[in-house]
Amino acid sequence: ELYPYFNLFGTYCSASRFSKQKNFFYYDVEDDNVLTVVKKVKPQLIISCLRGPFEAQVACHKHLVDYIQNFDCRLMFISSTNVFDAFEHYASYEIDKTLSESPYGRFKIKIENSLLSLAPSKYVIARLPMVFGTNAPRTKEIEAQVASGTPIEVFPNTIVNVTSDRKLSQQVHY
């Protein structure tokens, strides 16, 4: 979706299939400093959707915030609707106060709060619901359950939001 319109670069850690692509950089969130990659690429926009240990990601985002404060660069942080997971039975909106009971939601809140030191024009927080894709683990799990006739657990009276990987990339583009 984005490739025809922008010079795109990415990072990988365990997906070695990207190692031969010149627009991908090896980056281990636990051992490497993200600024090494950022200073090579000199991006105008960083889309942050890292995986890895929570504290290593928090440290990475501290480096990114410091960089963005001093350079012509913006950050789109891919967060999660888990920042509202304490509110099970009604919808939450972007202006609502975050409150999470899960470690994952609290971790995302910690990074979101670190971004508040930036000028509002320098960052966007995209709080994603469950994201499904053709080869996503959640999709594969549901397909396997349907194929085997295994019941799929549902949660009545709970608001659930979902999107697809393709719809997400379209929305990032616009």
Segments from the language model and where they lie:
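Residues at the starts of beta-strands that form the adenosine-phosphate
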Residues: Y5-F9, R74, K122
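N-terminal Rossmann/SDR dinucleotide-binding element
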Residues: E1-L45
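Conserved catalytic-core motifs of eukaryotic protein kinase domains, centered on the activation segment
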Residues: Q21, A56-A59, A86-Y90
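NAD(P)-cofactor binding segment of oxidoreductase domains
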Residues: V37-F77
